[in-house]
Amino acid sequence: MFRSIRSWSAIALFALMLAACGGDKKGDEESSGETQAACTRSALGAAPDLPKGWPDLSEVTYTLQTEQGPTTVVEGYFDGSLETAHDDFKRELEAAGFTILFDEIEEDDSEVSWKGKGRSGQVALREECGSDDKIFVHVTNRPA
């Protein structure tokens, strides 16, 4: 009898573990919809709220801006490849006097973490606009 209880307990525990590993499809769909909006909207009507001296890359179009507490999030797209976007942001941030805290480029995404002018944040770049030559841009900008 105890062996049967232990077996059923093990099966129940395994089922719970599998259920806990399931992804949140709704969250993924919402994120994808927000990304597509940033990739397809028109440019912001005013300059985005980024630190003074922020590089003005001609290939970047900022389309969305939101406030999340003390953090400003600016999104849009980069006309060009992921590698070019990564290299341009890193180079131009350094040239504008920002310190690069960390940068990484992978097959489908990239990050450049920065600090300067009393602010810090990250430029996240992802191949999620539907083509290899249009890259989703997500910039976080918060007090340092």
Where are these regions (language model features)?
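An acidic-aromatic pocket/loop used at catalytic or ligand-binding sites
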Residues: 2-11, 15-17, 22-144
